[in-house]
From Swiss-Prot:
The gene is mutS. Keywords: ATP-binding, DNA damage, DNA repair, DNA-binding, Nucleotide-binding. GO terms for cellular component: cytosol. Transmembrane segments: none annotated. This protein is involved in the repair of mismatches in DNA. It is possible that it carries out the mismatch recognition step. This protein has a weak ATPase activity. GO terms for molecular function: ATP binding; ATP-dependent DNA damage sensor activity; damaged DNA binding; mismatched DNA binding. This is DNA mismatch repair protein MutS. The lineage of its organism: Bacteria, Pseudomonadati, Pseudomonadota, Gammaproteobacteria, Moraxellales.
Amino acid sequence: MNSTETMADLSSYTPMMQQYFKVKLEHQHALLFYRMGDFYELFFDDARKAAKLLGITLTHRGKANGEPIPMAGVPYHAAEGYLARLVRAGQTVAICEQVGEGENAGSRCKAPMERKVVRIITPGTITDDALLGSYQSSNLVALCIQQNKIGIALLDLSASIFKVQQHEFKTEQLYIELARLMPSEIVVDEDLVDQNILEQIKKQIECSITKRPNVDFNLNNAQKTLCDQFGVTTLSGFGIDHLPLAKAAAAALIHYAKETQKTALPHIRSIQLEQSTDFIALDPITRRNLEIIDPLFEHGTSLFNLINDCQTAMGGRLLSRILMQPIRDTAILDARLDATEQLLIGYHESPVRLVLKEIGDIERVLSRVALGTARPRDLVQLRQACAQIPFLRHALLPAIQTKSSKLLNELDHELGDFKDLHQLLLSAIVENPPVLLRDGNVIAEGYDAELDELRKIRDHAGQFLVDLEIKERESSGIPTLKIGYNRVSGYYIELTRAQAEQAPAYYIRRQTLKNAERYITPELKSFEDKVLSSESRALAREKLLFESLLETLKKNIANLQMMSSAIAQIDVLANFAHQARLQNWNRPDFSPEIGIKIHDGRHPVVEALSKTPYTPNDTFLDSQHRMAIITGPNMGGKSTFMRQTALISLLAYCGSYVPAKSAKLGPIDRIFTRIGSADDLSTGKSTFMVEMTETSQILHHATHQSLVLMDEVGRGTSTYDGLSLAWACVLDLTKRIKCLCLFATHYFELTELGSESAIDNYHVTAKEMNGNLILLHKVQHGPASQSHGLQVAKLAGIPASVIKEAQKRLKILEKQQQQYFQTAVQNDLFAIPELPQIDETKIEIKKTSPVLDHLKQLDVDSLTPRQALEALYQLKDQLEH
């Protein structure tokens, strides 16, 4: 039974459950956290799901149609931990709070306390630190697809980032953009979205997909929605007036964010237009193979893990975004490099980093201020940041005095001056406030006279009671008379049963106990009213003052956001300088000419983790030398060399110094990788099928400005099939596509292509000493002489008996090959042998067959590379069966 089924007839339920159903009816898509006292309770299917996901007890409360109602709950004070787990599991949670008192409080038939949903937490709309890792971003993305065009919008509520783009719809390009944007949640039009596209997205990107009403994506209303949000009459200043699908996607995000946050979005004040051509394209496979953000293995180290020593969380998140979207504009890159160089001179980055260490996560604090969810300690973080601004500007002064870095000068200006705001927060908030406003004692003494007076009444209650107790003992003549308090009875004077007979006439009986009587007096009652009301009035006053502070901060939100952004950028630049000094990295140069020239390059992660000195290598590719075929033994360093070339290029196009003595790079539009081997068990694809699919993507989408890394193409099938494919791929990449390519292989026959134009042979060096193989990891010009496969197997621990047997077989095979070449006609490796003549008149062709029917139905021109390969496998399977 689920909650929806029970909503038809509510009359048999308690008032509280009737209220629950009414709220749940409006939020059927979400798990409803329904506040009941000190717990958030869940019922029916919500309870079952939460119990399974959170590992909490599933119990029951009352009955529905004669069956127990499933219930599960979590303590409200520990709810954040449970919410974080649910959001990580892709769930949406509606928080329903108690917002008032029940009616008829004095009667036995008390109405339920008023409740309402105060916010909806989804994977893409998180702003709470407790629900989001320090370096994680909560990116909400909307897709608006119509015919052959697509609009894409991104909103990060926690960082006030709002971006859009619109272009021709291509499935491959969409995957690349989603991999760059790293969405936590994708919003789509429930009426227009193609289910096949959604299924493919789910396979490519791990995130939640939420379907929204068509009205949210309405093209006619989008303009007004965005103009209202930004407080403008036209969007021409943002450059998106002519992009209807981009505007529709952006408007859909505004609608969704307002609905989930239950408030306006004052910190979303502008929108940025992006072009996919602004960035070097990195598909999901390349991002994974290069281990940019996440390592391939659980205990591995990614590039981000290695170089992220940013002193602020917002700096770390900015670094992550920079690594995920390397830019192609060399003017921006040189500005970053100039700033880094200026910080390196005289060790200026060190004092800057010391100041940055004292600054909290202001970016997220400001988002919570804007949304009205900021807590007292958020304002303390903001106060500390404002206090550090003068020190940060002073630390930057030596680096900007030469004015050689325009970027540093701009960032220094954007830091601003917040002395007045700092003074306001200093006078308004106590030094160490409690976590929650409702705990009181958040507003500092002396900030508000009315609050001080209410606190005085509350805080001096103890002394008043002591004085009153002494007074009553003396006037009544009862020396053991006591004055006490509890929440049920309030304040009281307690006498034993024996003493009750001596109670003065003005004592009014309040409560009778087994061995005592409790009384109230007019004076004590007056005091009680004053004290109890002062407590609640003080809390109400604090809430009012705190909200007033938030409103003041909202008025300064634009300048505060500029300050926050400047801090994050300075942090990243100082981190670049720190890494350059620490790792001995150097500044790269850019050239308009196609090519990659790296002298003594190193793999940054491998070098940092290696216990032995790293062997640097050169990379040389240009318009006359586009292809490097790399041969040599396994474990010799071929894959590491290829990856280091890609990572050095990536770092350079992020504006960072690079692990090389020098690096000069021409334009790069995309980096491809075909490295490693693995079955795709989820789709039933073999290692070879995965390899061919990835290779197909490269051959269809690489350009003359692409950097392509290909490792062991063709190894997943028979020797001649694999060699033929590898041979053809090398020629296609070199002659038709003309990209820059590093091609590692064990097919030594491919080295014959070194005589072709633009193709060079390289090998990783190794030598044998006393029967043992020593891998030198040096890349040198020319082909390898042998693969040293048996020696590598020996290093890997293969039993000696197996190695010995393999050596015997190797000698036999080598002898057979030598005899073959001595007697064979010296034909080209791929010369086609003469075939026996076939009498075509005797060939019987079946007019109909399932295979022919299948072929006739195929629209070959519309197939993607992946679909073409799958169709080929299906045809092969039909022939065999």
